[in-house]
Structures are given as C-alpha cells and as structure tokens.
Amino acid sequence: ATTAELCEHAYARFLTAINGTQNALSAEAVDEAVHLMQEARQVFCLGQGGSMLLANDICARFASLSTKFRTAGDSHLQLLTASLMNEADVVLFVSYSGATRDMMETLRTAKAAGAKIILLTHYEDSPGALLADVVLLCGAQESPLDSGSIPIKAAFLYVGEVLVLRYMLDDPAHSNTAQDLTSEALTVKML
C-alpha cells in the first residue's frame, strides 16, 4: 500500500468510529449523565490501561469548568478512592469491554458506598454496564488485533466532548466565568 492509501484507510477508520458512536449514543443517556455530574460533589474519571489515559483526557477537559473533576491513578488507588465515596459522588469510567476484573472491583466498591456510575463502553450488556446507572455507548467495533486502536480512542473522546458541551450549555453563566478564569490563569504559560 502507498502512504496515500494508508492515509485514506486511516481516515476511513476514524470516520467509521465516530459515525458508529454518534449513531449508538443516546441523547437521553447524555442528559442523564450530565445531570448526575452537575449534581455531584465529586466526579472521578477512571479507567484501566489505555482507557485510563482517555479518562484523564476527559477529566482535563472538564478541569477548565470545575474543580470537582478528579482522577485516581492506578487500580489500587482507584479502589481506595471508591471505598471513600458516598451518595454525592459520581464515577465516570471508561472501558471498551466493560468487563475487566479491576474495573468491576472499583465499580462494585463505589456502588456499595452509594456513588452513581456512568460507564463509557462498547458493550451495553457487559458486567460493568449492568452495574452502571448510565451507559454511554461507543459504537465503533474493534477486533482483538486492533486492541486500543487510535480511532476507537477518538470515538471515546468524542463522547467526552459531547458531555463537556452539554455540561457547559446546561450552566452557561458558570461555564463562561470558569473558562474566563482558567484562560486568564493560563496566559502566563504562553510565550
């Protein structure tokens, strides 16, 4: 394959991932998830492996709007954090499979503590989805050989961006003020 053909192939994979996710994503589930986040004392953006990086990216995007968004490191720290949650807290967990042992330990512990769970996943019948209060589907299909592909990651980040935009639009006065403050704070970092 030529480089031009590879570029076209990669482009098609990104479009397929985003389009599949847009078609699978429920507007009602987005609204419900954002409502939970707005009402929460804290929102913990969590994941394992490559999904933890995506959760961190989503958390960083929300950081310009509120200090209530947090991450919690590796699976051990996530489990410790989950044990200290209560009914005022929300977990936003990213997991393509929705079926990993570490994720289930963390989600069960958070649920037992009273926290609400929002799961970004591809599988609506996964163990994690069955435990979640809200499931946000990433519709992009991935084979085991493509594990952690960048188009799939982009599809999850697309869902994260939808959440951020809904969060901002539901409270524009606060969001505008927060963005002004954080933008001003970052100006000193520019050359």
Sequence positions of predicted segments:
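HTH-adjacent hinge/linker in prokaryotic transcriptional regulators
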Residues: 1-28
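Short secondary-structure junctions and interdomain/linker hinges
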Residues: 21, 25-28, 44, 170, ...
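Glycine-rich phosphate/diphosphate-binding loops that line cofactor/substrate pockets in enzymes
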Residues: 28-40
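Amphipathic alpha-helical interaction segments
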Residues: 32-35, 53, 57, 181
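Glycine-rich phosphate-binding loops that contact phosphosugars or nucleotide phosphates
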Residues: 39-158, 162-172
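A short, charged, Gly/Pro-tolerant segment at domain boundaries
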Residues: 173-191
